[in-house]
Amino acid sequence: MLTTPKSYITFIGRIGKKNHQFPRHSCLLTSPFGRKAMQFFDTHAHIGLIYDDPIEQLRVIQQAKQAGVTRIVSINNSLHDFERVYPNLKALPGIYHAVGVAPSEVTNPGSNYIDKIEQYLSNPNVVAVGETGLDYFKQFGDKRSQIELFITQLELAQKHNLPVIIHNRDAGKDVFDVLSERIPDSGAILHCYSEDAAYAKKCLDMNIYFSFAGNLTYRNARNLHETIMNIPLDRILIETESPFMVPAEFRGKRTMPAYLTSTAKFLAEMLEMDLEELSQQLWKNSCKIFKLSEE
């Protein structure tokens, strides 16, 4: 049974007031004296789409760390993009990588793409396969070809004992059906979650995590708000999906990993949790799915 707590109804009413604003966050989120600063983990950022310039990419990382976002998973839609971005970021502490072919590239995944993915999965700090999945909104290729590309990468994730990062747009049923049969043992992340609470609850029997982007902060994102209220806290991740899905307080700008704390603050208020407590749980969740030390 889906639940809608009274506290959530009150919360939605509050953010609906025209003069209500969430407090602007400072550059660095610090805990009281003698305690460690809060740390945040951006589980999905397209660094190479924010800026082409390698120097600007490094500045994005620096700004994120100043804002308390000390770990980021760098995402690319194609192997070509991975080959362009990875060399620039590979030596940076706290920056991790996923390798895969998104459904947008289904008609041209690249020659020998399977061999190349396997090769790159052995690179330092590569922690996941992805992003991959299904996208029926823009009708990239045909559905059968997308599903075949998706399954191929799920099998690679299983072979290499890695989680998979999943793109799902207007393809929820097929994504669920494929995962029901082929989800890798290391689990999956439904990134930039866009389905409803009922869909999420069906997924709970599988080792699936739900990653929420800046659109969680939109007042009309009722499906996302209800999902948050109906799934365990230990399955929740947050991401920026940079440069897309900008949080409400930064509307009109390109999303940056540094903006992740805006989504975290919104989520903390929504769940009536202390931000530091929430940040610790999100950190733990992220490290668990990517098999990283929490230290």
Predicted regions and their residues:
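Mid-domain alpha/beta scaffold segments of enzyme catalytic cores
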Residues: T4-R14, H20-E295
